[in-house]
């Protein structure tokens, strides 16, 4: 192994998160040697017991290379992704993982909305929107799974926990949060779907969407849910 590869490998395993991400990008550009180090890193760290940004970034970086041998290896070794798709109600989160792994954020957003309604029950699935009282009863495990998938596959840019952090930083004022995450500009709400940004150039917390036109109570119930303290978000 060359000195440069050795140094980057050490940086990947031992450095700060920021330096890890720099090392991942560099290793991905260094052909089989660098990519082999990334694959080994995945093998040692998956399945994740808790979300780790560097592991998500390695997986997504390798997928984004779109190299047949690597893609085949990832599909064989991680058929359901890198994070346990756990649900307290037996809900299948594999379609969400697949959409996020493919960086198809618009489809992932639609799936998330469907899964949240499924979590709330038949009434919500039929009407296709949520009551805040239904959100309060969501199992923490399911919200943790959904949020972890968004966070891991977006390099930490997307997820309800990201929105919540920005909401807290805004003094819990939704009028300050909406423009910060790109859901409103001045007095004008962002139009769905074309007004939203369905890639990683979007503002932090831009996705997944909530129907804020129905008011803030669903969002507030979600951001106040015990899942965030329970799982250390």
Swiss-Prot record:
GO terms for molecular function: tetrapyrrole binding. Signal peptide: none annotated. It comes from the Bacteria. InterPro entries: ARM-type_fold, GUN4-like, GUN4-like_sf, GUN4_N. Pfam families: GUN4, GUN4_N. Gene3D superfamilies: 1.25.40.620, Gun4-like. Disulfide bonds: none annotated. Belongs to the ycf53 family. This is Ycf53-like protein. It comes from Synechocystis sp. (strain ATCC 27184 / PCC 6803 / Kazusa).
């Amino acid at each position: 192994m060359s000195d440069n590869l050795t140094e980057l490998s050490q940086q990947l395993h031992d450095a700060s998160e920021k330096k890890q991400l720099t090392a991942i990008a560099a290793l991905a550009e260094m052909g089989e040697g660098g990519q082999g180090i990334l694959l080994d890193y995945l093998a040692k760290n998956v399945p994740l017991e808790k979300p780790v940004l560097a592991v998500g970034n390695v997986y997504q970086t390798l997928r984004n290379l779109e190299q047949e041998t690597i893609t085949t290896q990832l599909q064989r070794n991680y058929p359901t992704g890198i994070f346990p798709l756990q649900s307290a109600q037996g809900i299948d989160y594999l379609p969400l993982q697949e959409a996020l792994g493919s960086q198809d954020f618009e489809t992932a957003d639609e799936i998330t909305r469907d899964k949240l309604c499924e979590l709330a029950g038949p009434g919500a699935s039929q009407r296709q929107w949520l009551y805040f009282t239904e959100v309060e009863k969501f199992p923490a495990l399911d919200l943790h799974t959904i949020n972890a998938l968004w966070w891991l596959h977006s390099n930490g840019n997307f997820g309800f926990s990201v929105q919540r952090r920005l909401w807290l930083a805004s003094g819990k004022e939704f009028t300050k949060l909406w423009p910060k995450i790109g859901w409103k500009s001045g007095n004008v709400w962002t139009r769905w779907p074309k007004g939203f940004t369905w890639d990683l150039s979007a503002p932090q917390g831009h996705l997944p969407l909530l129907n804020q036109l129905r008011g803030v109570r669903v969002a507030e119930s979600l951001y106040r849910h015990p899942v965030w303290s329970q799982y250390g978000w």
